[in-house]
From Swiss-Prot:
Originating organism: Bacillus cereus (strain ATCC 14579 / DSM 31 / CCUG 7414 / JCM 2152 / NBRC 15305 / NCIMB 9373 / NCTC 2599 / NRRL B-3711)
Record field: catalytic activity: (2R)-2-phosphoglycerate = (2R)-3-phosphoglycerate
GO aspect biological process, one term: gluconeogenesis
Biological classification of the source: Bacteria, Bacillati, Bacillota, Bacilli, Bacillales
Catalytic residues identified in the record: H9, E87
S-S bonds: none
Chain sites annotated for binding substrate: 8-15, 21-22, 60, 87-90, 98, 114-115, 183-184
NCBIfam families, alphabetized: pgm_1 (TIGR01258), PRK14115.1 (NF010713)
Keyword annotations: Gluconeogenesis, Glycolysis, Isomerase
Stated name of the protein: 2,3-bisphosphoglycerate-dependent phosphoglycerate mutase
Described purpose of this protein according to its UniProt entry: Catalyzes the interconversion of 2-phosphoglycerate and 3-phosphoglycerate.
């Protein structure tokens, strides 16, 4: 049996401020740092270890992974970073307060932008200061690859391309893997692994910094999945609450 651990980054500064983040590179809040330490302690207490780690090129996911591995005394584990594991790009919504945006455009429209599978938010323009295609971390992207906006379907395509080319072969080689990423990135992976319909993924929420374990067969088909707490596996349908750490 193969085990895969997925973890969404700890609370970010813009999570705290209720702002659309997307590819904006904001850091963890103090609470997010605590959540990451707690996740590492949970994994260590439950006897987990890793051979390889994957994350995005955004600091909130990277720092969460660093902290988790530090808490587990696994700072030596190789870390592979890819923009393909970045959060969904929220286009012109990035940086805006979610409540204020709902007041401006209507709650129904914002809900469609946030939760539908195939509807993109308004796009950035290339002269927008939030357009970061010249950032050196994206220098390997080909012309036209840097998104101006994304729907979940767009995010899923790049995430699954990286899954099939990099992560799946690593798992099949017998390596224990952790992925530290973002809410919509993990939603994309869960949708694929659990073969969820578009309707099924609409209501799927991924909590910050709670380890989500997938037990997979040799073909990487899920046997079962569950969240972890200090007391071990959490009953299906329940999500553990954070403790002060």
């Amino acid at each position: 049996m193969i085990k895969l651990v997925l973890i969404r980054h700890g609370q970010s500064l813009w999570n705290l401020e209720n702002r659309f983040t997307g590819w904006t590179d904001v850091d963890l809040s103090e609470n997010g740092l605590s959540e990451a330490r707690e996740a590492g302690a949970i994994l260590k207490k439950n006897g987990y270890t890793f051979d390889v780690a994957y994350t995005s090129v955004l600091k909130r996911a990277i720092r969460t992974l660093w902290i988790v591995l530090h808490e587990m005394d696994l700072t030596w584990v190789p870390i592979h970073k890819s923009w393909k594991l970045n959060e969904r790009h929220y286009g012109a919504l990035q940086g805006l307060n979610k409540d204020e945006t709902a007041q401006k455009y209507g709650e129904e429209q914002v809900h469609i932008w946030r939760r539908s599978v195939d509807v993109r938010p308004p796009a950035l323009t290339e002269d927008d200061p939030r357009y970061e295609a010249t950032d050196p971390r994206y220098k390997t992207l080909k012309k036209g690859e840097f998104p101006l906006t994304e729907c979940l379907e767009d995010t899923e395509k790049r995430v699954l391309a990286y899954w099939h080319s990099e992560i799946a072969p690593t798992l099949k080689s017998g390596n224990k893997v952790i992925i530290s990423s973002h809410g919509n990135t993990i939603r994309s992976l869960v949708k694929y692994l659990d073969n969820l319909s578009s309707d099924g993924v609409v209501s799927l929420n991924i909590p910050t910094s709670i380890p989500l374990v997938y037990e997979l067969d040799e073909n990487l088909r899920p046997i079962r999945h569950y969240y972890l707490s200090m007391d071990g596996e959490v009953p299906e349908g329940e999500i553990p609450k954070h403790i002060s750490f």
